[in-house]
Amino acid sequence: MLKNQVKIGNWTYKINPSIKKYALRDAGFTQTTHGEFRYTHPLYLDSPYDTIGFVKIDVNESLTQLDILTVGNDKMTKINLFKNKKLQPVVDLLKFNLDDLVEREIISEVK
């Protein structure tokens, strides 16, 4: 795995070379006070009001570095969704969100 790639579960992603800042904003990313772009989406089993955590995606200001984390409800503690078979629907939701970002040409899946 190269330096600018992120592995989450069995998937590896990188920044799409044709990424634009306006595309990040259109996809729901917000710019932090430090200039990086952050996307946070709840992860849940049955109800979006009963979350088990969040996927947190950060892109640096120069659009060259990607970070993807699954975190608990406090948005700070890292959680591993891939160890528990009961969380497979949550893993499917995570994959759906990541596939949406691939479709929007924000990230690319490394094969």
Question: Can you describe what each PLM-predicted range is?
Answer:
Residues 1-27, 99, 109-111:
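Terminal, regulation- and interaction-focused segments at domain boundaries
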Residues 2-6, 21, 37-39, 76, ...:
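Generic, low-specificity signal for short hydrophobic/alpha-helical stretches with a mild N-terminal bias
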Residues 4, 14, 32, 73-76:
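Amphipathic, alpha-helical segments enriched in basic
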Residues 14, 18-63:
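Ser/Thr-rich, low-complexity intrinsically disordered terminal regions
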Residues 56-111:
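C-terminal basic regulatory modules in eukaryotic proteins
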